[in-house]
């Protein structure tokens, strides 16, 4: 009867957790003996009930959820859509993986929650349901893998495998699913032998660190403790954690409530007292921990607290260090071996959602949000501050919601939302710890790499080829095969990215080249001129700065004859390009030099200089200055010799002296000419000028002598003096009455007539007075008297492109370049095409700059090239040649497998194509052709690229404009918009039509060189099947080069340079992204080992450094530099220890394992018990860099006057194992020879205070019953010392008497 009054009656199902709680309360109330009898009765009752029920588990008891298959099917469809988005470049690999994990986790959780209600409705006595629900065997996750889906698994490195297991153990797994499942299983294909060894090694290191810690004293006398507050933890799970932390501890200070003491110091905390603290909402209580124990190599009873075995204070002599190491290592071993753990995806419910309660229009402040991209690649907004959201249905219903800061908003302002539509997400709890992860993306194709904007062109590292992005950017790999012949090919092209059509012939065929091959359309004439490539020299620098608005291309030319004709509105100009060479060659012939100036926009306006002609005979042979004579057709160059020296250089000649040629100026410099010397200073340099010529002294001033004037050859200057093409200059000396003149030699140049200059262009182009024509004019270097240096071009002939302005419409000229080289034959062609701006729908905006590369025209005929090596390749290859690593014999071939052709209008219903025209009624408008050329069209269809499916009708009504029927066609142009007009019999005025009226029927622009994504719609019923680049446009089809787009987010790293050749499998992009730490210890305890070894990437180590910096700033301002540093160090170490314990505890708690924090604190205490000496102020005590105990450093610091400078050191468990008081224990752990040799040199003494060293030497261990023997041994030694001191004192006292 007494027993019934003391125990409450529980009328509920007893799960494993409830049974553990019952046993704990029975032990607290009745003790161990009575509790054992009660548990025996429960055991007998359980066996009887199991025998009467006769439950058995069969395969028929496994009931699968009926909704599994349609959920999996829907998931596959969403996965297919995400994969298409990834292939199109809208999502990158990380976002695709995140979407995959999120979808399958949602599906798995839905099936898991649906499983148990089904058991309750169908059969509540199902053996599987009762077994897992009661906690007797199995849990929800394990039953879910039996009946639902296995889900996503991780590989041996802990990364998620992106192929989910859709089957379960009831249905069976396929071979692929079994291989993936074995990664997370205990005995599969991937064996756990290595992981078992790692787990055992972790336990061994933990025991090695704390094996010497034994309870040897009741109280150490400390007054310090750590504070724990229950106010911070309001939810039930956190309250249970608070009770687990303080139960079994000892109070470090009295606890008061309203001046009434409810617990005293050194009182152990029972379960009842802990609940009382929780219910009374105590602010904070101070408890004793192993961190605050004063003992050196042991621990006292009160700092340890109660024993976990009998729930009383720990007994003296208990080896708590061994228990602590085993309690941490053994759960990790079990989890690693998958004894009671199943693999899966770690996730947490940390996101809350807000959905629309009804249909309505949403309103919020748009200034409080900014656009961003979610982790899954979806567009969204982020709240800068708290955001109020209002949903109004237009009637009486109004809903108000509040989103906290940093929440996601998935709708726009004033958007209409439907009921249950997702509006936003916010975090419901504190976010988990994150870690930075690198994700590498590799190329799937061979080809060229290209990107658009938002890529920094400066290299991330000087010695590397990595570029970082500052915005979302698409990276394209243009397909192409890399060809490396065994012999050196003889037809390298002069520039990269030139596209030609090549027929590879046999090696026996001779070089064949047809100069009359037509490069353009049927109504045009091509100019081609074969020329043997001359020897190249280094290009000389020009003094003028380059124009940033144009591209200057140096061209090396030779006079030759050109035959051909010019078409209206189109001009072709051939030229030859001379690349720069570093090696010096033989002296080249005196050929003119030409610089082609092409605007970056690709367009020329009227009266614009497009080419500068430099004749080498008009280059200054030496320094000097220019002077213009009286004749307008001549100018002269007065040469002089100039030298620059340092101010400290010794000069052997004097100023205003006259020297001869080869006179020594300095020790290493001689003059080349003779003449008058002029020396002056210029900033930090000394300038020495030698004016060549000769002096003429005269006594009487002759009026014919003029200062700085020209004199003609054989001119009489008086006194029978005749000049010979000299420059006349008088020089007066002030100290002499005589004067003299300096007659300097001048080089005379004749200004050429522009019409007489022999330029390499066709003479007909300069003489014909047509719409397009080229004008020539001379440009001089500068005014008279301007000084110049050697190699300056004195006269430049400028070629100006011009045309007649026919009407008020503005015009401009587009430029196209074609360059081909076969062996030593170089063919370069520039094409100028006149274009006009009109008001029609397909005209572009004025001065629009095309960002696309200018492509050469499509070749109408296939040119034949020959090889000098023995190579045979398939014919009709369209190749884009790119050199690799400066190796000329390697190039990129664009074969038919890298391209595909799209035929336009294949799906039209009307297949009766009529390509007719009415020659009697021409159209006076100008239409744009394929290659950006304007045509004045009289016969519409032969000269413009239209495909018509309806009869053509043209009627001319008046002079100002034309009205005609719109055919069912569209215009495709390199620069213009692509418009489609499907309506028939619609009359329109092209000069009055505006762009916005036809915006609904307009399709995206397609240009040559344009990059297009997969499923890009080119018309109503046509789309691209794969991503690629348009490389050719024909009347009936497009040729598209295969390409693969990759999306790179901001702060990503791109490996490689623009237009670089990439092989399949080469790294392209490196993503830096954050993911939540799973704290999974199933792969050899990586997280626990990372924390225990105190690695540099450990978040605890990083937080300690950051906290010290913050505390040091605050304490220094309050207490000064010295005390601030001391206090901040102490606070930082205490907080770091507590944070260390919390992190290790979270790892185990995530797997459902709880470890007593006292055991973790013992490990952390040993890891933080060493300091590093940083200064050798006290000699012969410690060496700089020596590791010593913290308590020892504090004792010596108090004993000496001068302070010891040291800093705290966080040691990993492996290094802490080599820094113990016993060298015998260290030698038995690792590196036996090194440890024993070092101990012998240092003369270390092992006092045999630990367990391990006594076991090695076969002594009685100082724990348990052996503690008395150890204590008596130390007591006898202490009494001997005292007796020795007493005898010595008595002896001294007798001698004094």
Curated annotation (Swiss-Prot):
Region (Disordered) residue ranges read: 1278-1297
Q: Give cofactor(s), names only.
A: Zn(2+)
Q: Which Pfam families match?
A: RNA_pol_Rpb1_4 (PF05000), RNA_pol_Rpb1_5 (PF04998)
Question: What Gene Ontology molecular function terms does this protein carry?
Answer: DNA binding; DNA-directed RNA polymerase activity; zinc ion binding
* First-level EC class: transferase
Record-linked CDD domains = RNAP_beta'_C (cd02655)
Its subcellular locations are: Plastid, Chloroplast
Q: Which coarse location class applies to the principal site listed for this UniProt protein?
A: plastid
Keyword terms, alphabetized? Chloroplast, DNA-directed RNA polymerase, Metal-binding, Nucleotidyltransferase, Plastid, Transcription, Transferase, Zinc
Does this entry carry the keyword Ion transport? no
Q: Where is the composition biased (Basic residues)?
A: 1278-1288
Which catalytic reaction applies to this protein? Answer: RNA(n) + a ribonucleoside 5'-triphosphate = RNA(n+1) + diphosphate
Q: Which sites bind Zn(2+)?
A: 220, 293, 300, 303
What does the note under cofactor report? Binds 1 Zn(2+) ion per subunit.
Enzyme Commission number(s) = 2.7.7.6
Q: Which GO terms describe its cellular component?
A: chloroplast; DNA-directed RNA polymerase complex; mitochondrion
* The keyword Zinc belongs to this UniProt entry's keyword annotation: yes
One GO term under biological process is:
DNA-templated transcription
Q: What does this protein do?
A: DNA-dependent RNA polymerase catalyzes the transcription of DNA into RNA using the four ribonucleoside triphosphates as substrates.
Summarize subunit and interaction data from the UniProt record for this chain: In plastids the minimal PEP RNA polymerase catalytic core is composed of four subunits: alpha, beta, beta', and beta''. When a (nuclear-encoded) sigma factor is associated with the core the holoenzyme is formed, which can initiate transcription.
Which HAMAP family does this entry report, sorted A to Z? RNApol_bact_RpoC2
Which family does the similarity line name?
Belongs to the RNA polymerase beta' chain family. RpoC2 subfamily.
Indicate what this protein is called per its UniProt record: DNA-directed RNA polymerase subunit beta''
List the source organism. Answer: Welwitschia mirabilis (Tree tumbo)
Q: Which gene encodes it?
A: rpoC2
